[in-house]
Amino acid sequence: MNRGPGRESLLSPRASAKVQEAARLVLDRVEKQRLLPLKNLLLPLLIQSLYSPCVRADSLGVWEHQGEPVWIPRFHFRRTQVIKHRIQVGIFAGIHGDEPAGILGLMDFVRALDEAPELGRNFELWIYPVCNPTGYLARTRESHSGKDLNREFWKGSAEREVQWIEKEIAARQFDGIISLHSDDTAPGFYGFARGDVLAKQLLAPALAAAEQSLPRDSRASIDGFEAVNGIIEAAYGGILSAPPDQKPRPFEIILESPALAPLAAQRQAFRLALESILSEYRKFIAYGADL
């Protein structure tokens, strides 16, 4: 990554090299269809959290599945310890267990936050890279219960993962929610913009940024929804989102990569799109302050 002047990495060269090497190893294993234990899959982020002054790791909770502990990992990024208002954004991946590209892309993005600190200025980010750990371990879209967790939100679901994520989202009252997915029927990268017009204004440049890595899905109908230049303004019911009664509403964006594209290209597209969303949102806030 070209950091440019005044954008010195918050990681030492040694720590950065360790994180990058772990990321290469994880990508290699995933590309070869090898199932990694959760802690091995998340190794790049776990190493980064050991060395970074800005990233810390914990979980929403731990439970036992088939005799082994599983958990929903959570990572928190804040560039400095200065107490001030920050834009609160939650970024979620792995709600479908058979979509590893979003997990890898999100880990790359968190590494970029340390390597180019200006990127995270004015933000407090809450990162949830594996929201469906039992689905990941089974390599299935659904969780171990057979439920598609991304159709269960705000419906009084009995699914443990959904209940924990709902509680987290309700408590955080995010200014923005971003979800990462992959579509095995898509020829290119696209996204959903939900909420007010801001989501669409953020998504359009994010898709343009992702085009450095993957083509845009320009079909007029995507996944059964009307689309314009890769942007869909409708969505399925029960998806991961803010509580129905949250006011003001956050911007909500869903990024979708073409699942059959090379994993390296998908992860790069996710990173580029996420970087664009933060950059464009910061411009929006600055513009509003000048009005």
List the model feature ranges, each with a label.
Residues 85-88, 100-225, 243-246, 250, ...:
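Active-site/substrate-binding loop(s) of hydrolase catalytic cores
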Residues 2-75:
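Short glycine- and acidic-rich boundary segments immediately preceding or forming the N-terminal edge
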Residues 80-81, 114-119, 284-288:
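Alpha-helix termini
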Residues 73-85:
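Short beta-strand-to-loop junctions in surface cap/lid or active-site-entrance loops
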Residues 97-98, 262:
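Glycine-/small-residue-rich active-site loops that bind phosphorylated ligands and cofactors
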Residues 66, 81-84, 98:
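Short glycine/serine/proline-enriched coil/turn segments at secondary-structure junctions
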